Amino acid sequence: MRISHEAIYQSLYIQGRGALKRELVWCLRTGRALRAPRERSRRKAWAHVTPETLISERPAEAEDRAVPGHWEGDLLIGLERSAIGTVVERTTRFTLLVHLPREEGYRHKETPKNGPALAGYGAVTMKNALANIMSSLPVQLARSLTWDRGKEMSAHAQFKIETGIPVFFADPQSPWQRGTNENTNGLLRQYFPKGTDLCRWSAEEIEAVAHALNTRPRKTLGWKTPAEAFNEQLLLLQQAGVATTG
């Protein structure tokens, strides 16, 4: 007969209280008497995902790519918690890469509990880096940003205040809701292989990779490059501005 570990846990923990009987606590190496339900852990991890930021609240115009200015983003993760931020415009596939060097002191000192994240993509660091690279976009080309539920975007409310760009979060385990970004991350692995320290690349080198990707012709764009498609949108905005002032 086979018994799952979950059945053993349920037989030991006091039903309804999620706690061990007192005489069993001393047997635990961690001494942890309470057992937090997985759902509670998920709720804590996703506390930054509020009802108004769900992907279901994102403007419907973002779905068919007819209206430019809707972006998807994520982290490309490498060795030793290194990362590069990737942001892709849904209509033109134009890509921005975010340099995320490790903070000073990473792995060299004890990080205080609830202190700043030093891996390079803590919430405040991520917000600042994203705002720096996206705040220069024209309003018409910065309508929304869709991200997964990673805690690196916990400062999304402040990001919206600083840039005017609302952030929406995809549903759990639904990478297809950010399909453009997922596909782009796959292309980027040609330049940033898995298992490498992504902090070894400088901001200039990362920008060169973004340029290479944005000047690669795409079948989905009628063999235009993302840079050409994005520049067309910029030109349309300029022409509309001239027509309005004229």
Predicted regions and their residues:
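Mobile genetic element proteins and their domesticated derivatives, centered on retroelements
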Residues: I8, D74, R93, L130, ...
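Active-site beta-loop-alpha junctions of metal-dependent nucleic acid enzymes
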Residues: I77-R81, L97-V139
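Short, acidic, Ser/Thr-enriched surface-loop or helix-capping motifs
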Residues: E89-R90
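Acidic/histidine-rich, metal-coordinating catalytic segments
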Residues: Y121, A129-L130, S136-A155, P172-Q173
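RNase H-like two-metal-ion nuclease catalytic core shared by retroviral integrases
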Residues: W147-T163, F169-F192, C199-H211
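C-terminal domain-tail junction helix/linker
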Residues: K194-G246
